[in-house]
């Protein structure tokens, strides 16, 4: 997270983090511009009325919890395999990938679509794509540069 903090300070409002993680730790660590591509475990969505809201109670007092709006059943506000990415997150991430100059791929297998396609979107929009990973993965062909190793050791090489 130290790299993220330094990069965000250096780049200011030009820094955007797109995460596939659903745990909310990037926001808790201080990232101010985060797209939670696969949603957040700290949000709920009603299966009946679609109401969405933050819910940080842990553990939940009742499973499944009732919807405060209609009494229906709530589910975690995350994307399960086979579900569609929320339109807002997908559009925001694609817009950012098309507009960026530098797109970093960090610690992902690149096997989960459509998130894995964002590197190609960035590259086709003339961004430099750099992959930081332990081994080559599903987006390595899109990367202009592949840096092998643990992200905690290799990412700080970008920020002096």
PLM feature spans:
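Conserved catalytic alpha/beta core of Sir2/sirtuin-type deacylases, generalized to analogous enzyme cores
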Residues: 3-160
